[in-house]
Amino acid sequence: MRIGLYGGSFNPAHAGHLHVSRTALRRLRLDRVWWLVTPGNPLKDHGVLAPLDERVAQARALATDPRIAVTGFEGGIGSRYTADTLRWLVRRQPALHFVWIMGADSLGTFHRWRRFDEILSLMPVAVIDRPGYTLTAPSARAAQAFASARIQEADAPTLAIRPTPAWTFLHGPRSALSSTALRTR
């Protein structure tokens, strides 16, 4: 089974998250996408972060597609960093083929994530285009560091079964929605 892992604060979850998930399901030929609602992002301000249980409930109410599952399990395992969460999942589910999913806006700061290189060694990564990042994301520090591991967009359906490191950038229709913009309204 091929599972896309889409982590984030989901503060709040919105139609843009659904767009990214459906794009990944279709273009990567995934069976499921799991939304990993994080207890807190070490790189973001927690002052505006709604409680985890509220964000999980709101995300579940939005994600009515049966191929999308919402979980807040990171809080239960005491994980604070994506690399730790992904390592935990890979150890417990070795028969599953995971792909880490991220928006192109996150690729610009990916090199600041704790052990970002370990994430790329644990599973392939799919970067989904976002407005304003089409041209800048591929020149991000992490993208440059792993340029030789980038696969062609036409080969994206095979990403989940490729040896790591491997990543791709998926162009296409983009959603301009963002949780930050929704919170400031």
From Swiss-Prot:
GO terms for biological process: NAD biosynthetic process. Its EC number is 2.7.7.18. It comes from Methylorubrum extorquens (strain PA1) (Methylobacterium extorquens). This is Probable nicotinate-nucleotide adenylyltransferase. Signal peptide: none annotated. Belongs to the NadD family. Pathway: Cofactor biosynthesis; NAD(+) biosynthesis; deamido-NAD(+) from nicotinate D-ribonucleotide: step 1/1. GO terms for molecular function: ATP binding; nicotinate-nucleotide adenylyltransferase activity. Keywords: ATP-binding, NAD, Nucleotide-binding, Nucleotidyltransferase, Pyridine nucleotide biosynthesis, Transferase. It catalyses: nicotinate beta-D-ribonucleotide + ATP + H(+) = deamido-NAD(+) + diphosphate. CDD domains: NMNAT (cd02165). HAMAP family: NaMN_adenylyltr (MF_00244). The gene is nadD. NCBIfam families: nicotinate (nicotinamide) nucleotide adenylyltransferase, PRK00071.2-2, PRK00071.2-4. Pfam families: CTP_transf_like. Catalyzes the reversible adenylation of nicotinate mononucleotide (NaMN) to nicotinic acid adenine dinucleotide (NaAD).
